[in-house]
């Protein structure tokens, strides 16, 4: 093991640790990323790659705001990381749906989003409820099951290839 010196050490080379190190190295070139040798069995390799706002930060308004702000920075971040690493992240900001089954689940989701809106600093929250017919209009090629009552939709939601992201952060 060779000894390294740095002003900042980040322990953990998964998506979170590697992202922190990536951000820090742009401010301070003396950053050391410490991780185990085998990256095969990590949570970062098994995640879904969701860049998601919906439902994050309930009871924690600042976290909810950060989630929204973070998704607003994703296109620029993904573009810059792809350019620097030469690795396509397959990032897409498609918007996201949370499907509701039955009237009760639809009403619970609607109330939840209302609470998220109430806790926000400006009284807004970037998600909306879609009726079953509105949802069907968004998904014209999909036959909705009888229990589907609608969905919540957030235009900020999207996804990234988590394996490509991890590889690009480690380039």
Regions found by a protein language model. Give the residues of each.
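A short, basic/flexible loop-to-alpha-helix module at the beginning of a structural domain
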Residues: 1-5
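FAD-binding beta-loop-beta segment adjacent to the flavin cofactor pocket
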Residues: 40, 137-145
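Helical element adjacent to the flavin cofactor pocket in flavoenzyme catalytic cores
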Residues: 152-171
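Short beta-to-alpha linker loops that shape the active-site pocket of alpha/beta-hydrolase fold enzymes
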Residues: 37-39, 135, 169
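Dinucleotide-binding Rossmann-like beta1-alpha1 core, especially the glycine-rich loop
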Residues: 49-138
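Glycine-rich FAD pyrophosphate-binding loop
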Residues: 25-47
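Alpha-helical scaffold segments in soluble metabolic enzymes
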Residues: 23, 76, 111, 168-171
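N-terminal Rossmann-like FAD-binding beta1-loop-alpha1 element of flavoenzymes
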Residues: 6-33
């Amino acid at each position: 093991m060779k000894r390294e010196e740095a002003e900042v050490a980040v322990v953990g080379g998964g998506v979170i640790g590697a992202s922190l190190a990536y951000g820090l190295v742009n401010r301070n070139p003396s950053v050391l990323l410490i991780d185990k040798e085998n990256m095969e069995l990590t949570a970062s390799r098994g995640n879904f790659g969701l860049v998601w706002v919906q439902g994050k930060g309930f009871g924690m308004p600042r976290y909810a705001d950060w989630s929204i702000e973070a998704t607003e920075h994703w296109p620029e971040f993904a573009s810059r990381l792809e350019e620097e690493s030469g690795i396509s992240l397959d990032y897409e900001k498609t918007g996201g749906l949370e499907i509701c089954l039955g009237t009760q689940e639809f009403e619970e989701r609607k109330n939840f989003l209302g609470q998220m809106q109430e806790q926000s600093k400006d009284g807004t929250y970037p998600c909306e409820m879609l009726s079953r017919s509105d949802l069907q209009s968004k998904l014209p090629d999909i036959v909705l099951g009888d229990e589907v009552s609608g969905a919540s939709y957030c235009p900020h939601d999207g996804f990234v290839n988590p394996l490509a992201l991890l590889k690009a952060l480690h380039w």
